[in-house]
């Protein structure tokens, strides 16, 4: 009888472990769906406020400075949700925004000394 109880205990533990794993996998899938939905929502908003050349410019910036592109996107989405953007933004507008955000950055100074 002792062996049967031990076997039953092991089976219960395995079942509980499998159930936990299934729940964790389900939670991961749900989180991924939420992230995808948020990405789709952001892209939809950006399509409404940026013309194709502006989107392309922002994507090019993302290749070099993903943090800067995210910052610009977040600001644009926030302004759009507040109703402060009432026209399509062009590539020139994006260039102006990028220059304003990066103008405060200090450029490294390289001095060359000759002997």
UniProtKB/Swiss-Prot annotation:
Matching SUPFAM superfamilies: Double-stranded DNA-binding domain
Chain residue ranges for the region called Disordered: 1-41
Any one of the GO CC terms: cytosol
Family as reported in the entry's similarity comment: Belongs to the PDCD5 family.
The species this protein was found in: Thermoplasma acidophilum (strain ATCC 25905 / DSM 1728 / JCM 9062 / NBRC 15155 / AMRC-C165)
Keyword field: DNA-binding
Stretches with biased composition (Basic and acidic residues): 26-41
Protein name: DNA-binding protein Ta0052
HAMAP family reported for this sequence: dsDNA_bind
